[in-house]
């Protein structure tokens, strides 16, 4: 599998084949543009919410609750450390722009996009979602930025008839408190994903109630148990907001899409919010809907 260590070993081997054991290392993170921290995100999140960069490791985190303020340089230093272990001395590390005439001497190939999407959904990886949305923006001729990603998502919603009056997209992860999306649009998007094999990875990546990802510890009370193992859904939580959207199979075999949103709930604990969402889905799973 692709890894920084594998890339360092291949790079070191290529350099040694050229008779080189000492280099200066430049790193280029210019694929993405604009701010790395959204102006629509709360400033109090800066300490723990990762910056979005085209070059980073460990999802831009120094630890679980500590964001890396300089993801590209951290990635470059980690690469230099692995080069050293492979027998290459790095004399300097600098930010630069790769020349178009540069020669590639080593590469590794990432997991497939389908697997990346699945992991992003399963653990609710905000940086993963932002990175995917930036690549989608670049593929559609837009900047790899927050604005470019938001414009790309908005355009996709419009093309597929999922745009509703009052909706607003500010990022690719849903972190912005100013994002606006209706439950109807979410349910319609889920219906599209189930019907179109293009989005098979999205369906496969949804957490399963009481089994995987962000739903592994949910649906744990008796009133929620009808949803266990049959509800497949993406979770979403911000202060005062929680959501659950996906699909389920009822006890008589009907496959239904659903989307639930709870707003203005800052006085209610997350546990109570989750219980409400889970019980609502469980009630639907118990129904005879044919």
Per-range role (PLM):
Residues 4-12, 73-76, 277, 281:
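Short, hydrophobic/amphipathic alpha-helical packing segments
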Residues 1-54, 58:
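Periplasmic/cell-envelope proteins involved in peptidoglycan metabolism and beta-lactam response
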Residues 137-290:
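Small-residue-rich helix-loop
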Residues 17-21, 81-91, 286-289:
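Structural alpha-beta junctions
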Residues 51, 57-200:
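A small/polar active-site loop signature that marks catalytic segments
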Residues 29-41, 88-101, 210-212:
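Short, glycine/proline-biased beta-turn/loop segments that scaffold the active-site neighborhood
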Residues 28-32, 42, 58-62, 137, ...:
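Solvent-exposed coil/turn segments that connect beta secondary-structure elements
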